[in-house]
């Protein structure tokens, strides 16, 4: 394979059997120039180059971002694929590299990164969050920069989105933000404080994610007969009224509708928090 274009010391474009490829590898372009032969032992990652905006953006990132940021980003992606035992959506190489480099730049300049969805992310995406913790140690070792938990949450979101082959983070953010909004409604309407580091909190967040994903997919997940629905409405009156408020809010803000039986299950989760708050 001959080098067609050098993007940086660790990235080149080659032509191989009528296909253009982007090759990544530490020092793959060191002391090389156009038309030189590629050293196969230097190749760490190969991408078939396609004439799409994603690949044009990828090349632009490889040419413009700091090379150590790109190397760290690729190490994190490789670690994620190994830990999750999957092949991650290739779009992550653009979005994540760009995000991580900007985050490192902000932290280097003493700026504070805040993530209002951090607690939900820890519960919803625990494996991805562990990968973020691994990334923190790597970045500290390579750059001497400490990555706060808030940014680890952002890393986890990128990994989760790419893991599920989503085109962007919109759906992941929508679900996580919706859950954060629901929890705030419960706290405000019932005048209670939901402690995040508890089993009940984890159950509620996990249940909401599961329900939202299945309802969005048009799948029925629970069966409750009319008698049981009436019992829940009567026995857990305040909790059910809170669930109704949640349903109204979510429909208005997200265009998403919880069926009545799902609101009953949400009411049962709410009741746990409400009972504990009243008992104190």
Curated annotation (Swiss-Prot):
Pfam family, one: CAT_RBD
GO MF annotation: an example: RNA binding
Domain PRD: 64-169, 170-280
InterPro entries in the record: BglG_antiterminators, CAT_RNA-bd_dom, CAT_RNA-bd_dom_sf, PRD, PRD_sf, Transcrpt_antitermin_CS
Annotated positions of the Phosphohistidine modification: 99, 207, 269
SMART domains reported in the protein's UniProt record: CAT_RBD (SM01061)
PTM comment: Phosphorylated by HPr (PtsH). Also phosphorylated by SacX on His-99, leading to its inactivation.
Domain of life: Bacteria
Region (RNA-binding): 1-55
Keywords carried by this UniProt record: Activator, Phosphoprotein, Repeat, RNA-binding, Transcription, Transcription regulation
Biological process (GO), any one: positive regulation of DNA-templated transcription
Similarity comment text for this entry: Belongs to the transcriptional antiterminator BglG family.
Protein's job: In the presence of sucrose, SacY is activated and prevents premature termination of transcription by binding to a RNA-antiterminator (RAT) sequence (partially overlapping with the terminator sequence) located upstream of the sacB gene. Formation of the SacY-RAT complex prevents alternative formation of the terminator, allowing transcription of the sacB gene. In the absence of sucrose, inhibition of SacY activity by SacX leads to termination of transcription.
Protein name stated in the entry: Levansucrase and sucrase synthesis operon antiterminator
Species in which this protein is naturally found: Bacillus subtilis (strain 168)
Phylogenetic lineage: Bacteria, Bacillati, Bacillota, Bacilli, Bacillales
Designated gene of the protein: sacY
């Amino acid at each position: 394979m001959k080098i067609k274009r050098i993007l940086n010391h660790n990235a080149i474009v080659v032509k191989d059997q009528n296909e253009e490829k982007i090759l990544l590898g530490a020092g793959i372009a060191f002391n090389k120039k156009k038309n030189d032969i590629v050293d196969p032992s230097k190749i760490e990652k190969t991408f078939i180059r396609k004439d799409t905006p994603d690949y044009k953006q990828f090349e632009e990132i490889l040419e413009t971002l700091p090379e150590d940021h790109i190397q760290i980003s690729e190490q994190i992606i490789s670690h994620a694929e190994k830990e999750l035992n999957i092949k991650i959506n290739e779009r992550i190489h653009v979005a994540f590299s760009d995000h991580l480099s900007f985050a490192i730049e902000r932290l280097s300049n003493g700026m504070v990164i805040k993530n209002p969805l951090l607690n939900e992310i820890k519960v919803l995406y625990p494996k991805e969050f562990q990968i973020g913790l691994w990334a923190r140690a790597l970045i500290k070792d390579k750059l001497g920069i400490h990555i706060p938990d808030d940014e680890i949450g952002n890393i986890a979101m990128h990994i989760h989105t790419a893991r599920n082959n989503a085109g962007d983070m919109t759906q992941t953010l929508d679900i996580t933000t919706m859950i954060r909004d629901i929890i705030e409604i419960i706290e405000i309407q019932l005048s209670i404080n939901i402690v995040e580091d508890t089993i009940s909190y984890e159950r509620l967040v996990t249940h909401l994610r599961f329900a939202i994903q299945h309802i969005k997919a048009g799948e029925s997940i629970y069966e409750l007969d009319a008698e049981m629905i009436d019992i829940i409405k009567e026995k857990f009156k305040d909790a059910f009224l809170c669930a109704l408020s949640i349903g109204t809010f979510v429909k208005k803000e997200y265009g998403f509708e919880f069926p009545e039986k799902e609101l009953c299950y949400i009411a049962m989760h709410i009741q746990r928090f409400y009972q504990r708050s009243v008992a104190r």
